[in-house]
From Swiss-Prot:
Protein name: Phosphoenolpyruvate-protein phosphotransferase
Subunit field text: Homodimer.
Molecular-function annotations in GO: kinase activity; metal ion binding; phosphoenolpyruvate-protein phosphotransferase activity
Reaction catalyzed: L-histidyl-[protein] + phosphoenolpyruvate = N(pros)-phospho-L-histidyl-[protein] + pyruvate
Broad class of where this protein is predominantly found: cytoplasm
Domain of life of the source: Bacteria
The keyword Cytoplasm belongs to this UniProt entry's keyword annotation: yes
Family: Belongs to the PEP-utilizing enzyme family.
The organism of origin for this protein: Chlamydia muridarum (strain MoPn / Nigg)
Cofactors demanded by this protein: Mg(2+)
Residues the record lists as binding phosphoenolpyruvate: R308, R344, N454, D455, R465
Any Gene Ontology CC annotation: cytoplasm
Amino acid sequence: MGATSQKELQQEFVIVGEPVVPGIGLGKSLLLGKSSLRIRELTLPQEEVEHEINRYYKALKESRSDLAALEKKAKGKQGYQEIASILQAHLEIIKDPLLTEEVVKTIRKDRKNAEFVFSSVMGEIEKSLCAVQKTTAIAVDRIQDIHDISNRVIGHLCCQHKSSLGESDQNLIVFSEELTPSEAANANPKYIRGFVSLEGSKTSHTAIVSLAKNIPYVANFSAESWQRIREYNGNLVLINGEKGEITFNPKLSTIQAYYRKQSAVSMTVPIQIEKTQPLISLSAQIVGVDELGSISREFPGTTIGLFRSEFMAFSLGRLPFVEEQVAEYTKLVQFSCSDINVLRLFDFGEDKVCPFIASAHRSVRWLLEQETILRGQLQAIAIASRQGKLKVLIPGVLDASEIILVKQMFQEEVQLQNGISENIIWGSMIEIPSAVWMIEEILQESSFIALGTNDLAQYTLGMSRERSLPGNWKQVPHPSVIRMIHYVAARAKQRNIPVSVCGEMAGDHLLLPMFIGFGVRELSVVAPAIHSLKMRLLALNSKECSRLAKQLLRARTYEEVHKLLNM
């Protein structure tokens, strides 16, 4: 591909990637280069070995200070608990004895320079992750974490660092082949108006950080497109995180059109499709009650559709005490909104590892194995029930027996704590195929149902959620997943039990008409997605939604689903 002419570089030009985080942003493009650090292998004289070890310790200390400062900054801001938990994980990795003992031992034994030894050790860790976990979502995140930490420590060893995205004083759209979580965490959202990376996914740590900061993010471009992007460094850019579009040198009319669409919908527009169409609610997901203030200001009346209680442990670096849980849950109970708020029981396992507790189980089976922890949480819920009503969601159920056990334990705690049993409304999270086929029995024990689409798709297809998947799965759901969602929604509708949907699919505006057509009553999404979903809802009507839903149920391939959703 030849170089782009000067005239072409000044014309409006659009490149399309994959949407990761929704939103619109305008700014000057800033291309972050790959690390130019070249690690050379050096053999040291014996008298320099201890000095080299001290130099390594200093680099580790400086790296820990960097991360601790970022974590402290994140902990002090509303809605940033997930960012803090990711940075806490980086701190735990960098404190690992392997990174001190193994590296120091090798420097002493082989008399090699710290950069070379550290890089080799981190490379071996990455190889072992790839060998054990293949290309799972967990492995991809861990490898990205390893890259991030390696670059930070080696940067200190070589006295070279990337410029901080927190120091910008102009509006920028940041382009990077591999955008790291700590780079995103350090970005000042006042000036950093968008992220664009060669590769990325909606479930990556970088995406989680970007979403928490409400910074639009687009990723996954061909090598040819990325090469062309590099030629536009320094040009004005408009990023559309809903469509995955990057517009270079946007005309004034293009910019005005985008922002007219964005401002056309008031944040408080009623979410009623039409008079004859049942209400479909948009509720907010949170990871801490300190987000309630911003939800109330930006989206008045919005219900909390999912409080992810396990993030209390990630933020604290330990399991929360019962008293701490009571304080959080009471605030959730008392939060004024249009419906009853939803608390999900601790959902540990796989990529969400509970601090200091190793277990092969996940979700409700993890809780039943760790009965003391479960009873502590149920005790806190029982105490909070004195203040009002609360919906409680049991994660990852296999069948009705697990629901019965949890409810029995709760009744015991309610009696001990003088709680009000009637104030707690029990629901079940359907995210495992076995639960889909046991839905009749599960509905008998549940007052509401939440479909967790991320895990449901992953376990149904036997795959990772990450970019290694074949075909179009990362853009559209497989027909089998669509049919499972419909099956659950239809069975629940027969019993007049409300169904909500959470996960990436809930925030996908292309799937909105399908959910409405299936009779889903609520979509639980991260706060930044609410505005764009409201905009999409204004353009829908019930007849078209029902028609599309029926067509999607007849689809046999990814391609047919993709065609129907993009008609």
